[in-house]
Amino acid sequence: MSAFSEISPQQAWQLVQQHAAALLDIRNETHFALAHPAQAFHLSHQSYGEFEMQYEDDHPVIVICYHGVSSRGAAMYLIEQGYTQVYSVTGGFEAWERDGLPIERIG
């Protein structure tokens, strides 16, 4: 895969439930703590090394942001780093919440 694919929040959740992909939330720490998709990994500059240790380059990854814009850039970056199956969630966390998909809160 030389480019990422866009998927709906429902498609993303289905892949996560099947343990077929890792869900990476790139929103800031405050917003992630307030609410994030269930089972999401908070991907930041600080946690990137941990992410790389947990997931091989061929493991499917799904990137989610606020509205589905920033995740595209992050998806391209992951492809440039050698990840081969990368997806971006259309509409971001806003669409995830609107669709009533599971969320978690910290604290």
Curated annotation (Swiss-Prot):
Q: Where is the active site?
A: C65 (cysteine persulfide intermediate)
User: What's the catalysed reaction?
Assistant: thiosulfate + hydrogen cyanide = thiocyanate + sulfite + 2 H(+); thiosulfate + [thioredoxin]-dithiol = [thioredoxin]-disulfide + hydrogen sulfide + sulfite + 2 H(+)
Report the InterPro entries cross-referenced here: GlpE_sulfurtransferase, Rhodanese-like_dom, Rhodanese-like_dom_sf, Thiosulf_sulfurTrfase
Keywords in alphabetical order, please: Cytoplasm, Transferase
EC class: transferase
| Example of a GO MF term | thiosulfate-cyanide sulfurtransferase activity
Per the record, GO CC terms?
A: cytoplasm
Q: Chief localization class?
A: cytoplasm
Give the family, as the similarity comment puts it: Belongs to the GlpE family.
Spell out the NCBIfam families in the cross-references. PRK00162.1 (NF001195)
The protein's role, per its UniProt record: Transferase that catalyzes the transfer of sulfur from thiosulfate to thiophilic acceptors such as cyanide or dithiols. May function in a CysM-independent thiosulfate assimilation pathway by catalyzing the conversion of thiosulfate to sulfite, which can then be used for L-cysteine biosynthesis.
Q: Which PANTHER family match?
A: FAD-DEPENDENT OXIDOREDUCTASE, THIOSULFATE SULFURTRANSFERASE GLPE
Q: What is this protein called?
A: Thiosulfate sulfurtransferase GlpE
Q: Organism, per UniProt?
A: Pasteurella multocida (strain Pm70)
Q: What is the lineage of its organism?
A: Bacteria, Pseudomonadati, Pseudomonadota, Gammaproteobacteria, Pasteurellales
Q: Which gene encodes it?
A: glpE
